[in-house]
Amino acid sequence: MYLITLLSTIVPILLAVAFLTLVERKILGYMQLRKGPNVVGPYGLLQPIADAVKLFTKEPLRPLTSSVSMFIIAPILALALALTMWTPLPMPHPLINMNLGILFMLAMSSLAVYAILWSGWASNSKYALIGALRAVAQTISYEVTLAIILLSILLMSGSYSLTTLITTQEYIWLILPSWPLTMMWFISTLAETNRAPFDLTEGESELVSGFNVEYAGGPFALFFLAEYANIIMMNALTTILFLGAYNNPMAPELYTTNFATKTLLLTMSFLWIRASYPRFRYDQLMHLLWKNFLPLTLALCMWYVTMPIMLASIPPQT
């Protein structure tokens, strides 16, 4: 039974990832006044399937000087972690209802750094290594603000469990009382998932393709799947944290529809941002975090800690 529930989560995620690639290419196409993929199937709808078949039937080449075991493990680890992070997400019922769901997700996203680092190092290529080091520095840096923002939100909800956030937001979305946090959270998720304008790891102009430059066929597809699964997961988490979907216990399907719509809109905004903005310079990326976001989030965290104490009240205990 547990295997069925696991598959009923993983299969739709992978399907969503497949069609997200198509949506991205379509949006970028129309924003650049062209059609995008429109040959395979009606309106290009079968393009993701054709891409998958092409990638997985290719020979998985690897450089002679590469470290074999790490080179193979890295993409598998990346996808495994990307899928593991979905377990505590309430949709409206999580796969595993964890008391420390948020902490688990932070730990998993930190582990994803290893997959990138190993892939860059095991490739034995200068470009891949520089791309991997950039990715690691960027991910670790932005995780600092993500953790502080999460702490501030949890102070409002009163529990580390994600399901409590649904109850907290019955009357008001947390985006309204904590909009500065929401803005910084959204920009940090862009950086965390290595998306434009923070896609320095894949800087085509200087690093060819970044940490996955030496990968071909299947392993490359696994990295690709992991990246897009992370994008959807981050937007799902944003929806749960700030745009709490309406939850009626009598009709849980309403929650799922509401949740999916908001996640889709946020994901579309990721693609819109990619089509609109140029890439940041590396030092600007770091300055934005360490000199702007970090002091601001720390100050706001202090504010959210002191407010209940000043008003002599505590958040609801669960």
Swiss-Prot record:
Membrane topology: Multi-pass membrane protein
Transmembrane domains' residue ranges: 3-23, 70-90, 100-120, 146-166, 171-191, 222-242, 254-273, 294-314
Reaction(s) catalysed by this chain's protein: a ubiquinone + NADH + 5 H(+)(in) = a ubiquinol + NAD(+) + 4 H(+)(out)
A GO term, aspect molecular function: NADH dehydrogenase (ubiquinone) activity
Ribonucleoprotein among keywords: no
Subcellular location: Mitochondrion inner membrane
Enzyme class: translocase
E.C. number: 7.1.1.2
Keywords, in A-Z order: Electron transport, Membrane, Mitochondrion, Mitochondrion inner membrane, NAD, Respiratory chain, Translocase, Transmembrane, Transmembrane helix, Transport, Ubiquinone
Example of a GO cellular component annotation carried by this entry: mitochondrial inner membrane
PANTHER family noted in UniProt: NADH DEHYDROGENASE SUBUNIT 1, NADH-UBIQUINONE OXIDOREDUCTASE CHAIN 1
Family: Belongs to the complex I subunit 1 family.
Biological role: Core subunit of the mitochondrial membrane respiratory chain NADH dehydrogenase (Complex I) that is believed to belong to the minimal assembly required for catalysis. Complex I functions in the transfer of electrons from NADH to the respiratory chain. The immediate electron acceptor for the enzyme is believed to be ubiquinone.
Protein name (record): NADH-ubiquinone oxidoreductase chain 1
Gene name of the record: MT-ND1
